[in-house]
Amino acid sequence: MQRKLDSEPLRTRIYIDGYNFYYGCLRGTPYKWLDLLPLFEKHILPSILVTDNHGQIRAWRLLESPSIKYFTAKIIESVARAGDSVSSQARYHTALRKLHDGRIELIEGYYAVNKMKVKIVDPENPDKAPRECREIQAWKVEEKQSDVNLALQAYHDSITGQVDHAVIVTNDTDIAPALQMIRAHTDVRIGVVVPTSGQNRSANTDLIKFAHWKREHINSGELAACQLPRVIPGRKPTIKPESWYGQPELLQEILDLAIPVRGSRAAAFKWMEQPNQFLSGERPIELVETAEGATRVLQYIHSWIAQQEELP
């Protein structure tokens, strides 16, 4: 017997653990300039089925203000892996706010950097008890409040009747007690999305046992399809960091050759965003996401420059 689709959509809000999402899906990929709203609205949520306590299929609708609560923390320059990490993260946060004003709310915790004493593993006897190992002083970097903020916000929105359907994007078991309380005190449906772009990290059982549904990965095709525009317009345009492209070093080589020809960096990027008949109709800006594609663009530019030098 076919289950009946209830006519009243579930008011849905998404809660994203930004730290967990970055390390699970985005680190080391060309997809960091990610547009979160269409990723969930057009890809993730349409792929799942939500049922109520009676087994009826329920439609959903994203709340408008906000649709997504994104929990993050500003990178500290002294521990950043790259020289532009701080400015690149700031650009991304600005882009989300500008493009989706009101629909994505950024809620910030902070990073704490402290010196602490730790025991090091004995290389000659890795199984030696920690109490017998040598002690050294080391830096400890911790993100603070993001998981607590997510748990509190999800519970608050549920207990105050703001949502019917809470989608939790994390694989952090610290969130599990909040989900348990939501299940115990409300009828809110809970979904858990594990932020990993591969299928090699399974969902934590302590987390998903409180979920009504789960999705255990986000594939690279979905991430690629949901990239922000390269330039977000405004009084001061927000531009995708060049280090966030798939092949930043090759991109720089391309720009070094293209800028003198086109006259400016902006003009060079404008050329790269147009389909190129000499590159099988593909756009150079998309080709530079892979080493093979970027090499094709470089070869074309070198060939074009050589031809120009041979002209009388």
Swiss-Prot record:
Keyword NAD (UniProt) = yes
KO phenotype (gene knockout): Cells lacking this gene are still able to grow in nicotine medium.
What does the record give as EC number? 1.14.13.163
Pathway named in the protein's UniProt entry: Alkaloid degradation; nicotine degradation
Please name the GO terms that the record assigns under molecular function: monooxygenase activity; RNA nuclease activity
Identify which top EC class this enzyme belongs to: oxidoreductase
Please provide an example of a Pfam family that matches this protein in its UniProt record. NYN
Q: Which residues form the NYN domain?
A: 14-210
Which reactions is this enzyme annotated as catalysing? 4-(6-hydroxypyridin-3-yl)-4-oxobutanoate + 2 NADH + O2 + 2 H(+) = 2,5-dihydroxypyridine + succinate semialdehyde + 2 NAD(+) + H2O
Q: Which keywords fit this entry according to its UniProt record?
A: Alkaloid metabolism, Monooxygenase, NAD, Oxidoreductase
Matching entries from CDD domains are given as: PIN_NicB-like
User: GO:BP terms for this protein?
Assistant: alkaloid metabolic process; nicotine catabolic process
Function text: Involved in the nicotine degradation. Catalyzes the cleavage of 6-hydroxy-3-succinoylpyridine (HSP) by incorporation of oxygen at the 3-position to produce to 2,5-dihydroxypyridine (DHP) and succinic semialdehyde.
Any additional notes? The catalytic efficiency of HspA is lower than that of HspB.
Record protein name field: 6-hydroxy-3-succinoylpyridine 3-monooxygenase HspA
The gene is hspA
